[in-house]
A protein has these predicted regions:
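Active-site environment of divalent metal-dependent phosphoester hydrolases
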Residues: 15-20, 43-51, 72, 85-91, ...
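Core catalytic region of metal-dependent phosphoesterases/phosphodiesterases
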Residues: 1-74, 143-145, 150-163, 192-193
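A structural motif corresponding to the C-terminal end of an alpha-helix
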Residues: 33, 117-126, 159-166
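Structural motif
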Residues: 6-7, 76-77, 126-128, 167, ...
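Divalent metal-coordination and catalytic microenvironments
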Residues: 8, 13, 37, 42, ...
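Binuclear metal-dependent phosphoesterase catalytic core
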Residues: 141, 154-166, 174-208
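Short, well-ordered coil/turn segments that N-cap beta-strands
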Residues: 6, 35, 124-125, 186
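Conserved catalytic scaffold of divalent metal-dependent phosphoesterases
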Residues: 52-151, 192-194
């Protein structure tokens, strides 16, 4: 990888069940790549409630974990957060009715606000957004339509269009589509490894 790219981006789900003992062997592999690494966490990484421990483990070996934060390197700004579910376009859930629904929507809005803050930190001429959940519907096409609302949220795409970016990458939609654009025409790429390997079994990453 280091001969082909300047930085490696990991779009979440570094573990299956969010356990530090799962993270340790992955870190041992990543540090041997000898390339700068930028990551966000995915929903799997939250399963055991040990996400803070996972972030600490990654940070201790120099992996930059973005959680509503921005990072600049060699003239490129990276803004990232996990994102959240909530649906797309007219199918996006709104904060109406039961407290449980309002709490659900608040979590989605909070992640969009985290992305807004992260993007506001960037001053570099080139801007890359790193997410786990999708900001657009196009890159979840291929998944069962019944679960599209659980794969991302248009709220993230609205933030991206409002602030501007050159490239967006996300994971999570294992059987979605590789490429799409936001309403404003910004490129979005699904880099979920299951999807990549369904196209080419030997592929573990994409080059941009």
């Amino acid at each position: 990888v280091r001969d082909q790219a300047d930085v490696l981006i990991v779009a979440g789900d570094l573990t299956n069940f969010g356990k530090p003992e799962e993270m340790e062997p992955l870190i041992n592999i990543l540090v041997r790549l000898r390339i700068p690494i930028i990551s966000v966490l995915g929903n799997h990484d939250y399963e055991s409630g040990r996400e803070s421990d996972l972030i600490q483990m990654m940070s201790s070996v120099g992996i930059k974990v973005l959680d509503g934060t921005g990072y600049e390197r060699d003239g490129v700004g990276f803004a990232g957060t996990k994102g959240f579910i909530g649906g797309f376009g007219r199918g996006m859930l709104t904060a109406f009715g039961e407290p449980e629904v309002k709490a659900f929507v608040k979590a989605s809005i909070d992640e969009a606000l985290k992305l807004e803050r992260a993007m506001a930190q960037l001053r570099a001429p080139k801007r890359v957004v790193v997410l786990h959940y999708s900001p657009i519907a196009a890159t979840v096409v291929g998944e069962a339509p019944e679960i599209h609302a659980y794969l991302g949220s248009s709220r993230l795409g609205e933030v991206i269009d409002r602030n501007g970016a050159d490239l967006v990458v996300h994971g999570h939609a294992h059987h979605g589509s590789l490429n799409g654009t936001t309403t404003g025409g910004i490129r979005v790429h699904n880099v979920a490894i299951t999807l990549l390997q369904s196209q080419e079994p030997s592929v573990a990453y994409r080059i941009f």
